[in-house]
A protein has these predicted regions:
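Bacterial N-terminal signal peptides
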Residues: 7-17
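N-terminal Sec/ER secretory leader and immediately downstream segment
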Residues: 28-59, 64, 68-71, 78, ...
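Extracellular/lumenal glycan-associated surfaces
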Residues: 59-62, 68, 161-163, 170, ...
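Sec/Tat signal peptide C-region and signal peptidase I cleavage site
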Residues: 18-22
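Acidic/histidine-rich, surface-exposed loop or edge segments in extracytoplasmic proteins
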Residues: 51, 295-302, 445-450
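Extended, polar beta-sheet/loop recognition surfaces of beta-rich domains
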Residues: 463, 561-606
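Flexible coil segments in periplasmic/lumen-exposed cytochrome c-class electron-transfer proteins
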Residues: 23-35, 44-47, 80-150, 172-257, ...
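C-terminal structural cap/anchor segments
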Residues: 533-576
Length: 638
């Protein structure tokens, strides 16, 4: 008996790897895995979401999908979940995603039976789709979308297999201007000629049609020149992706003043604030919300009327160093001149030389919308008298040359303290708490302390680890998400190796005694009744990526064990990440990141609090529970 039992045990051990018992599915590095943030809403393999709101992606022309990804990222189409997911991604990665979904040739489900319609309405819809209406100058849909209505290469999508509600929403979006495209925006012009009855007729008829067996887009055919533009197949299409002309980590020649300035503009991430979503680079107009109202960034292009084309290098130095415009107006510190005042005159002149090379864009500067008395120059003068002194910073004499260079970058053009240093009631930085963490102004993200080990401190990191994180946004110790992903994407990845190492050296040397004590770790298990509920939520929503023990997948999905975003005293970043998902930045050294889907539509406040509390107490994590109030406040705009 014992011999038989022993043989069974030996056999079971031998077969265990083959049986796969107790093992998690093997991780597959594929585009299907990299686009899980997409399929979460658009269905497995992009077959379409279950509610009719998220359309099918599979099999659509790649150029069309690419255009739509750009439109969402750049504000021509409006859906905050999509915009947030796509902001850290490059054009080339968006094209790769589009090509992946375009290559999926999957069967369509049968059409949903049409309700609340009449034969006359369906006949009108068929006429508009197949023949158009010459009197209204409405071309037939088939002229562009193909005789089979399955789309036309390279840019025109198919119209079949789409829910009626989705078709109505898109036509309505074009009519109201909520949906736009690159010019020529043919659909906006055509949709404007459709009345409500025509929109309903078209959507009813299209939604009732069966998708043909060959659902692939067809090659382009001759367009009806009497009703549509000659370049109809290019309507709304964007140029192909191009590579940045300024390579990440390249070091400009010190004698090339404008090239040096272009590098410094990357260090300061000037583009990030002085460009609106989808707007011309450096043309300004981006609104920066503050507790006192909204400040709009200025036009930095070479236009003489609305930009800085008529400025001198002395005018620019005055703005950077003293916070005064060319006309002597005092500037609002939403423009971080309290940090830029540390910039050297040579670097200011180089930055100005670069800005003068930017093509002129005539775009008037938008007036600020600040409340009284904050909108007055007198109030600003009082603020400056209290909190601003122009002048270069004097780093500690005990710092190495590398650390001194790092201090110049971190506290000057890099203006890290703008987010990471707490502010007082009047919006001034509190020097005694420099870089010790703060809620970002008018946002629900928390900029962690760069000194506290429990938050964003790097005292136990090597300088190489810090430099690599600034270059890629990815580390075994954590990833860049939220606003920091934008900083890595547009700024720190472009720094030279020497400058990143200098910043790392200074940040490691900045683990000075902290004026406020670090918050306690909380508890691992207080016996909350919701612990099992949290484990169930983790099983349902998180385990497939982050693993049964929160171990994650190196290079793809971060470990949750010991993750500071999970365990830091302020839980806001954890809550925001679960709510909105996101990608790590697509950098030159990490160009194809993996993403996390948003769960804002899947989890209510109680569920999200329960899940967050579980993450903060499971495995070896120790942090205080998250309450429903924490989640509710994180969902709301300040």
């Amino acid at each position: 008996m014992s011999g038989t039992f022993l043989h069974c045990v030996v056999l079971l051990i031998a077969l265990w790897p083959l049986l796969g018992l107790g093992q998690e599915p093997a991780f597959e590095d594929s585009m299907a895995e990299r686009t899980r943030a997409c399929s979460h809403c658009h269905g497995k393999e992009g077959r379409a979401g279950p509610d009719g709101y998220y359309p099918r992606l599979a099999g659509k022309p790649a150029a069309y999908l690419y255009n739509q990804l750009l439109n969402f990222r750049e504000g021509r189409r409006h859906y905050s979940l999509m915009t947030g997911l796509l902001e850290p991604l490059t054009d080339s990665y968006l094209m790769e995603m589009a090509q992946y979904f375009a290559g999926l040739n999957l069967p369509y489900p049968p059409p949903v039976p049409t309700v609340a319609t009449t034969p006359a309405q369906l006949a009108r819809g068929q006429t508009l789709v197949m023949q158009g209406d010459p009197q209204k100058k409405i071309p037939a849909c088939t002229d562009c979308h193909g005789k089979r209505l399955t789309g036309t290469l390279p840019h025109v999508p198919g119209l079949l297999g789409l829910p009626r509600d989705y078709l109505n929403a898109q036509l309505g979006g074009w009519q109201t201007g909520q949906r736009r495209a690159h010019g020529p925006d043919c659909m906006a012009a055509i949709s404007a000629r459709l009345d409500r009855a025509d929109v309903s007729a078209v959507s009813h008829w299209l939604a009732a049609q069966k998708v043909p067996a060959d659902s692939r887009p067809q090659a382009p055919g001759p367009a009806n020149q009497a009703t549509i533009q000659p370049d109809a197949t290019r309507c709304g299409s964007a140029p192909a992706p191009v590579t940045s002309t300024f390579a990440a980590g390249s070091s400009p020649a010190p004698t090339d003043l404008a090239a040096r300035g272009a590098y410094l503009a990357r260090v300061g991430n000037c583009l990030g604030c002085h460009t609106t979503t989808g707007g011309a680079h450096y043309a300004g107009g981006r609104g920066i919300e503050t507790p006192f109202g909204t400040v709009f960034t200025s036009n930095l292009t070479a236009d003489r009327d609305s930009g800085i084309g008529a400025w001198s290098s002395q005018d620019f130095w005055q703005a950077m160093h003293e916070g005064r415009s060319k006309d002597q107006r005092l500037l609002y510190p939403a423009f971080p001149y309290p940090s830029f005042t540390h910039l050297s005159r040579a670097d200011s002149d180089a930055l100005f030389a670069f800005l003068k090379t930017i093509p002129a864009v005539k775009q008037a500067n938008q007036p600020h919308t600040l409340r009284w008395p904050y909108r007055t120059q007198a109030a600003l003068a009082v603020w400056r008298a209290l909190y601003f002194t122009p002048g270069a910073e004097t780093p500690g004499t005990d710092l190495t040359d590398a650390a001194r260079r790092g201090a110049y970058l971190v506290n000057g053009l890099g203006h890290c303290g703008t987010c990471h240093t707490p502010r007082n009631a009047l919006g001034a930085s509190r020097p005694s708490l420099e870089l010790q963490g703060a809620m970002m102004t008018m946002q629900r993200w928390y900029a962690p302390s760069l000194r506290a080990k429990r938050e964003g401190g790097v005292g136990d990191w090597s300088v190489e680890e810090v430099s690599r994180w600034l270059q890629t946004g990815v580390s075994a110790r954590g990833i860049a998400t939220g606003p920091m992903a934008q900083v890595v994407l547009h700024s720190t990845q472009y720094l030279t190796d020497d400058d990143r190492l200098a910043m790392a050296t200074y940040l490691r040397a900045s683990q000075w005694p902290i004026a406020r004590p670090e918050a306690g770790a909380g508890t691992t298990d207080r016996g909350e009744p919701g612990r099992q509920a949290g484990a169930d939520l983790y099983e349902a929503w998180c385990k497939s990526c982050h693993g049964a023990q929160g171990q994650g997948v190196a290079g793809a999905y971060p470990a949750l064990v010991g993750n500071r975003t999970v365990t830091m005293p302020n839980p806001n970043n954890l809550i925001q990440t679960i709510l909105w998902g996101g990608y790590t930045p697509a950098t030159a050294q990490h160009p194809r990141p993996f993403g996390m889907p948003p769960f804002v539509l899947n989890l209510n406040d109680q569920q999200l609090a329960t899940l967050s509390t579980y993450l903060r107490s499971a495995w070896r994590n120790q942090a205080a529970p998250v309450t429903e109030l924490d989640v509710r406040q994180a969902r709301e705009k300040p």
